[in-house]
């Protein structure tokens, strides 16, 4: 959403954070979808959350299916994951003009979608660094981080403060961490990086990420 389809890793799902309870957020979203917009309506259906080992329940994203209809007929389902506000990541937003979406909406005769509130970049970077250096299989964050830093001027000092707070809050791995290759990353990374303006070799991408962590840690 931040950079447009031509410059980002394609994904069909949507992640969001809320300062309220995720269930209450889903209720409000469901009410808005029921009211509809330009012939589109929808409903929010809860899914069973994951149960990752040694991860407190309150840290686990709450999954939902957003089932959209157009003129009363099923159209598509969008997987949605709602997280809680950990360290103020839902307190403020970067408001972004959706140029690609605006053009697509205009071509279809729909009103402009307007601006979208996105999580501030320093929080996104901190969360992705925490994920890619954790025990999970998050090689995709190596691609996302390169896209973010090649397309945005990110405040390293602010990112450092956010990383320190997030890593201390989650109490999983210490800051600064180290990215280490995991089984299967070669093939997964190659598939994700193909056709994108990012480092094509996973080993070199890991070196880049660890150098980035050092830059942030000393900012």
Features from the language model and the residues they span:
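Non-catalytic nucleic-acid-binding interfaces of large nucleic-acid enzymes and RNP effectors
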Residues: 13
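Structured mid-to-C-terminal alpha-helical surface segments
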Residues: 2-8, 18-219
